[in-house]
Each structure stands twice: as C-alpha cells, then as structure tokens.
Amino acid sequence: MQNNNVQKNSVTLVPGVGSAYKNGWRQLWKYFLGLFLIGIIGFIIGIPTGMNEWVQGATAAGILGFLAFIYGILVEGPVQYGVAFAFLKAARGDKLEIKDMFEAFKNYWNAVLASLFVGVIIVIGLVLLIVPGIIFACKLAFTPYLVVDRKMAVMEAIEESWRMTGGHAWKVFFIGLLAIPICIAGLLCFIVGIIISLMCVNLAFASLYHAVSSSGMASVQEGVPTT
C-alpha cells in the first residue's frame, strides 16, 4: 500500500542511528509546542490505566484494574499509535496538528488489535528469554507507523515492519539503547529535561522509520552499520 500522507517537501534522511537522532533534535525545536501539547494530552488520556492504584481493597482494585486494562486496549492504545504518527509527521517535516494524535481512530480496530498483538508477541519473547523479546520489539517497532500512516491491516503491518527492519533492526536497538543515557541526563535536569529527552527519542524512532520507508533501502538481510 502506498503512503499518501507524505508531503513533497518532507525531510530526506539516510537510515542511521546518528542521522535519526540528529533529525530528531532538529525537528524537536521546530515542532516543540505542538508535540508538547500532544504529549500532555496523551499523558492525561493515559491516566485512567493506573486507576486501580487509587483505591484500597483487593476486590475494588481488581475491578478497576480490569476496567483500566480494557480502557488501555480500546482507548489508550490507539491514542498512543496516533501520538507516534504525530511524531512521524514532525520527523519528516510535515504540517503538525493536534488532531493528528487521533489519526489511529480512522483505522481503529487495526490499531487496537495491532497494539494488543505486538504487546503479546513481545511479552512471549521476554518470557521465553530476554533476547527474543528484544528482537521482536526491534523487528515490530515500525508497526504503529504502518497502521496509522499507511492504514495497513494488523498482519500486513506486522509483516511489513518485520520486512522493513531487515538490515535496520540493530539501528532500532541502538536508538533504544541510547535512550537510556539520554533520559538519565534528562532526569538530572528535572521535569523539563526528561520531557525534552522523551520527545527527542520518539522523534529519533520516527526519523528512522521515515528514512527506511522513503529510501527504499529496507531489505531482508542485515546491512553494514552506518551512523
């Protein structure tokens, strides 16, 4: 399925860890206010998923926990996919609007099921051994973008993410690995620092997807590392 959402003046990138973070940092300041507002709204929408911790008593906590789980699947999951799409639009230099964070609702059930399936696959991998879980997480990292950006069905998005990350999965891993010291540095700068760090990391992931998607360099074999 062709991607009709990319604008002609989109940022051109070569897939790489360094280029992804460089573009993420550059676009962060260009779209800071819009992304900040989207992040705040997304955070508020996600608050009910932890509501089982608000009450005492096993029964009440259990009921609220179940409701929070359902809410997380049906509401927060699609919203988080929409937030990822908003970061993608910023990463490639497109016009960003608050409503972009709700874009996943245009492909609602595929977003719900994709979020659920990917989560289950990663958990199974982590339960078996930590390494398979990490591999699954890296190979399926592009699924949210594909579901929202290209309006793909669940299995189509999962298969395409697996294909696209061939030769690039290690880059997804190192972007995630570098996120650890970046977020630690952000914590040292308190609230403002961690917000900037998280936004930069999300933009880096989105930048890598955009680079791989637009360059046609996705392959089924591992490539030579480039930064």
Where are these regions (language model features)?
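Selective recognition of hydrophobic, aromatic-rich stretches within alpha-helical transmembrane segments
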Residues: T12, A60-R92, G119-E159, G186-A218
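Alpha-helical hydrophobic membrane-insertion segments
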Residues: L33, I41, I45-I47, A60-I70
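Juxtamembrane "helix exit" motif at the C-terminal ends of alpha-helical transmembrane segments
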Residues: I44-G57, L187
